[in-house]
UniProtKB/Swiss-Prot annotation:
Keywords: Cleavage on pair of basic residues, DNA-binding, Host cell junction, Host cytoplasm, Host cytoskeleton, Host-virus interaction, RNA-binding, Transport, Viral movement protein. InterPro entries: TMV_movement, Viral_movement. One of its GO terms (molecular function) is DNA binding. Belongs to the tobamovirus movement protein family. Residues 230-244 have a biased composition (Basic and acidic residues). It is found in: Host cytoplasm, Host cytoskeleton; Host cell junction, Host plasmodesma. This is Movement protein. The lineage of its organism: Viruses, Riboviria, Orthornavirae, Kitrinoviricota, Alsuviricetes. Residues 211-244 are annotated as: Disordered.
């Protein structure tokens, strides 16, 4: 059975100089580099859009920023060996209204691959205020897995590496902001994510899922209000899909270890 790596290494996502690691916080806008605690999603439906807390256990700074440097997603099929079918997993920033821009990364793997893992490098900042609103979601699309309703065929776990900032001033009297170096060890991951994006049409699925759930909500609101509002045009054009690529499950070589990441800081 193919098992996966169970420990998150900060150095796989970011390079910190010795000064950035050991200087007191008053000398740098980087207050801490942290590994979040594990957040888990149990998948019960063929298609679902669920909120995920990528900053679980991370202490945020009031009025500051958080940089999502990296993300490790681990999944396990709760099925017998050699089952058919597979799953597409898509990380979503729900703030973005265009589906293709909301789709941060997508990944596909077969159910026969009992356990899998992939890494993502989002590499962008959000404000503490936005982070407190739980802005990330996971779109899961299970295909051709025949299991009775009400059971859980798949479990997903998420751990992130993030940097907490007091401010984003790049140069100051005694400050220099840290960044992911161009030659960092995870440059390849950004290329891999691009391959996911070009082969897996998860942005199309996200647009359809949002449209479907939006119509259900709109219908309920109209029934509750009792207003005779005009029905939406059934001939309304559907959003065109974007081509995206898939990266097969080829990141996995090691044996899995049970691991819960506690917050870690410099």
């Amino acid at each position: 059975m193919a098992l996966v790596k169970g420990k998150v290494n900060i150095n796989e996502f970011i390079d910190l100089s010795k000064s950035e690691k050991f200087l007191p916080s008053m000398f740098t806008p980087v207050k801490s580099v942290m590994i979040s605690k594990v957040d888990k999603i149990l998948v019960h439906e063929d298609e679902s859009l669920s909120e995920v807390n990528l900053l679980k256990g991370v202490k945020l700074i009031d009025g500051g920023y958080v940089h999502l440097a990296g993300l490790v997603v681990t999944g396990e099929w709760n099925l017998p060996d050699n089952c058919r079918g597979g799953v597409s997993v898509c990380l979503v920033d729900k703030r973005m209204e265009r589906a293709d821009e909301a789709t941060l990364a997508s990944y596909y793997t077969a159910a026969a691959k009992k356990r899998f893992q992939f890494k993502v490098v989002p590499n962008y900042n959000i404000t503490t205020k936005d982070a407190e609103k739980a802005v990330w979601q996971v779109l899961v699309n299970i295909r051709n897995v025949k299991i009775a309703a009400g059971y859980c065929p798949l479990s997903l776990e998420f751990v992130s590496v993030c940097i907490v900032y007091k401010n984003i001033i790049k140069l100051g009297l005694r400050e220099k902001i840290t960044s992911v170096t161009d030659g960092g060890p995870m440059e390849l991951s950004e290329e891999v994510v691009d391959e996911f994006m070009e082969e897996v049409p998860m942005s199309v699925r996200l647009a359809k899922f949002r449209s479907k759930t939006g119509k259900k909500f709109s219908s309920k609101s109209e029934n509750n209000s009792g207003n005779n509002r005009p029905k939406p045009d059934k001939n309304q054009r559907k959003e065109k899909g974007l081509k995206v690529r898939v990266e097969k499950d080829n990141l996995i070589d090691n044996e899995l270890e049970t691991y819960v990441a506690d917050s870690d800081s410099y």
